[in-house]
Curated annotation (Swiss-Prot):
Biological process, per Gene Ontology: translation
SUPFAM superfamilies given in the database record: Ribosomal L27 protein-like
Keyword Transcription regulation recorded: no
Species the sequence originates in: Cyanothece sp. (strain PCC 7425 / ATCC 29141)
Top-rank taxon, per record: Bacteria
Similarity field: Belongs to the bacterial ribosomal protein bL27 family.
Keywords, alphabetical: Ribonucleoprotein, Ribosomal protein
UniProt xrefs under InterPro entries: Ribosomal_bL27, Ribosomal_bL27_CS
Record-level Gene Ontology MF annotations: structural constituent of ribosome
Bias (Polar residues) ranges: 7-19
Region (Disordered): 1-22
GO cellular component: cytosolic large ribosomal subunit
Protein name: Large ribosomal subunit protein bL27
């Protein structure tokens, strides 16, 4: 067994914190205005009706309502929030 660590092992041992990205509110969930819907890098999901986009591409609800995931175009997804009364009918 070596009594010295060796140069490689002493230089390792670093890791960055997780960014906690992903969908935070799923389709059919009732949300309040300002709730974060998705944290993402780039626009995997695009903002739809009543959804805003932050500087870091985070999508958030601008009104109280129900979350819906929609497809549009050939290969794009968008997230919209519709008022609860409209979603019930």
């Amino acid at each position: 067994m070596a009594h010295k660590k060796g140069t490689g092992s002493t230089r390792n041992g670093r890791d960055s914190n997780a960014q906690r990205l992903g969908v935070k509110r799923y389709g059919g969930e009732v949300v309040r205005a300002g709730n974060i819907l998705v944290r993402q890098r780039g626009t995997k999901f695009h903002p739809g009706n009543n959804v805003g986009r932050g500087n870091d591409d985070t999508l958030f609800a601008t009104i109280d309502g129900v979350v819906t995931f929609e497809r549009y175009g050939k290969d794009r997804k968008r997230i919209s929030v519709y008022p609860v009364a409209a979603a019930a009918s």
